[in-house]
């Protein structure tokens, strides 16, 4: 927030064009002794890249379903091309660093805008910087509650767990979700939330978005404006790289980290839509190979 004030920016960007404008103004504050960047995108971090890319209006990297077949979705995709051009221009104009240690730079007051998750809150609080939390922009500035942003973590009990271990894990999960050991449920009906549950307390203290409806609908969670503003709708798509049902999620995610960095650092300057088509043809082929390997 201090960088925003020094740069004369009064409003939080709600569009990607406004992000660029803010990044330019904040980057102008940089000196040789104290480098400052207006934008802090992690070009190597798959999940955060995907969150940004989806806000441009594109779908999964790989679309379709098992019945009708899957297909790669990098080419002939205007929204994807727009996202890639925007990311690269931020870097080429000197508004976004190449470094991967964006967290430390943010904590040092050297980054104006960044994407991250609730796990960073403790670091930022400890640093003492004056910061705020807002939803990612969109192309038009309209909110897109239909996309879940960032990381939605889950508890799982593996098939290799012993009966004793599985039972202990189940008891912990029930306690975490309800605070009482009651069976976890999908609605708030018949559940006493007069006391804050461990799950809700953790979300509130970390400012971490929650997908468990009883927690989201609890009065404690609803009392935190920033959580309410950022929590996706109940019908939101979970942020993923590939359409549900694919068997190569991790391969596709790894591919994305490679191609975003390759494009940003090695792609042509002043890129066009056609440049994106030419550059990503090989990565489109890589994704098609994943599909063929798993389903042919």
Predicted features along the sequence, with ranges:
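Short, solvent-exposed loop/beta-turn-alpha elements that line the ligand-binding surface or hinge
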Residues: 30-31, 59-82, 138-147, 239
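Extracytoplasmic/periplasmic solute-binding protein
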Residues: 17-71, 111
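Extracytoplasmic/periplasmic substrate-binding proteins
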Residues: 44-51, 85-175
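Bilobed periplasmic-binding protein-like "clamshell/Venus-flytrap" ligand-binding domains
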Residues: 28-44, 97-98, 181-190, 289-296
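C-terminal lobe and pocket-closing loops
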Residues: 123-130, 142-149, 155-255
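Glycine-centered hinge/linker elements that transmit conformational signals in sensory
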Residues: 23-25, 67-99
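Short helices/loops that flank or line small-molecule/ion binding pockets
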Residues: 4, 24-26, 100-114, 258, ...
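Conserved C-terminal helix/tail region of periplasmic/extracytoplasmic solute-binding proteins
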Residues: 5, 225-296
